[in-house]
């Protein structure tokens, strides 16, 4: 099967109608973090002064005072027109796995390190955010992964991932054995420290550190990156996003394993289990300030060289 480079299915980015308006906005952030709390307080004050109804995720609401409605992520997804996540990419990933099912627009204020998914600066967000709230923004859909663990043909655990699903041993630096199938066609057996199955969104995260290629967000593709394979010939491979990836763990593995979703959610895996990873029907709807440039983000975050002439 060839890789589908038709970026129009589904559409990766579109300009939103200038008449789009937001009314109820949810605030989400990293709990017990001084910088995040300061930004959340500024956001809450600024948004309420603009006349918006503001809800705060319950883990951060207690640090914002008493005059704010505290709700969980599910209620933010159900009631809000926009969610603002303050923190790093990890905070965005945690919120996105819940909010993607609501098709809620999400924008980030960077209080982390690299901040590939968080566009707004924490100390000067007002001007850019005001334009977004006036309808001047771009939207971009990022697909998620669905990871399932089967034991003796029965589904034992499942979850979703925005960046990657990783099969790995319970112990650090311990080799495991497994087979990999693409759409039920045997690809190879592996003796490695694990396998990273990444979306284009995750290709600048763990997969990049493991030697994988960067995939632009509009590609409908997945990248499989073996972790320290016990062979010189095994390299990352890119497959169509419609592919179903199956990994069968050897019964001879002498310990328990895990599938980690974005490094946050861990699914228990036993020797002999099968792991199925496929594209989820859920998509993250990212909101960017108008004119957002992905390659500018790469240059800035990864320290690439600027134009020579």
UniProtKB/Swiss-Prot annotation:
Protein name: NAD kinase
The reaction(s) this protein catalyses: NAD(+) + ATP = ADP + NADP(+) + H(+)
Entry keyword set: ATP-binding, Cytoplasm, Kinase, NAD, NADP, Nucleotide-binding, Transferase
Main location: cytoplasm
Keyword Lipid metabolism: no
Gene name in the database record: nadK
Pfam families from the UniProt entry: NAD_kinase, NAD_kinase_C
Segments forming a coiled coil: none
GO MF annotation list: ATP binding; metal ion binding; NAD binding; NAD+ kinase activity
Gene3D superfamilies given in the database record: Probable inorganic polyphosphate/atp-NAD kinase, domain 1 (3.40.50.10330), Probable inorganic polyphosphate/atp-NAD kinase, domain 2 (2.60.200.30)
NCBIfam families: PRK01231.1, PRK03378.1
Cofactors demanded by this protein: a divalent metal cation
Active site: 89
Localisation per UniProt entry: Cytoplasm
Organism lineage string: Bacteria, Pseudomonadati, Pseudomonadota, Gammaproteobacteria, Alteromonadales
């Amino acid at each position: 099967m060839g890789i589908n480079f038709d970026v129009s299915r589904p559409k990766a980015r579109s300009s939103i109608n200038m008449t789009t308006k937001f009314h109820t906005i949810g605030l989400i952030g990293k709990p017990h973090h001084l910088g995040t709390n300061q930004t959340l307080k500024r956001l809450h004050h600024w948004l309420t002064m603009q006349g918006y109804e503001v809800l705060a995720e319950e883990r951060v609401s207690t640090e914002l005072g008493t005059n704010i409605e505290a709700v969980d992520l599910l209620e933010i997804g159900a009631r809000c027109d926009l969610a603002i996540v303050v923190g790093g990419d990890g905070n965005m990933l945690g919120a996105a796995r819940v909010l993607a099912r609501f098709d809620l627009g999400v924008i980030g204020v960077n209080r982390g390190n690299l901040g590939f998914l968080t566009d707004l600066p924490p100390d000067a967000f007002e001007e850019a955010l005001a334009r977004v709230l006036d309808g001047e923004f771009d939207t971009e859909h990022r697909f998620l992964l669905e990871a399932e663990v089967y034991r003796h043909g029965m589904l034992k655990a499942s979850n979703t991932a925005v960046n990657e699903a990783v099969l790995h041993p319970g112990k650090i630096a311990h080799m495991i054995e497994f087979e990999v199938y693409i759409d039920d066609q045997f690809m190879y057996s592996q003796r490695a420290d694990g396998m990273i199955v990444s979306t284009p969104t995750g290709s600048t995260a763990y997969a990049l550190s493991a030697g994988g290629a960067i995939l632009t967000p509009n590609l409908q593709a997945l990248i499989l990156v073996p972790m320290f394979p016990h062979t010189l010939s095994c390299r990352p491979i890119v497959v169509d996003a419609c592919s179903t990836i199956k990994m069968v763990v050897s019964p001879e593995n002498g310990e328990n394993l895990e599938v980690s979703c974005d490094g946050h959610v861990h699914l228990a895996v036993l020797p002999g289990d099968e792991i199925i990873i496929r594209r989820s029907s859920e998509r993250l709807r990212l909101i960017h300030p108008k004119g957002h440039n992905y390659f500018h983000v790469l240059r800035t975050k990864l320290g690439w060289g600027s134009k020579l002439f």
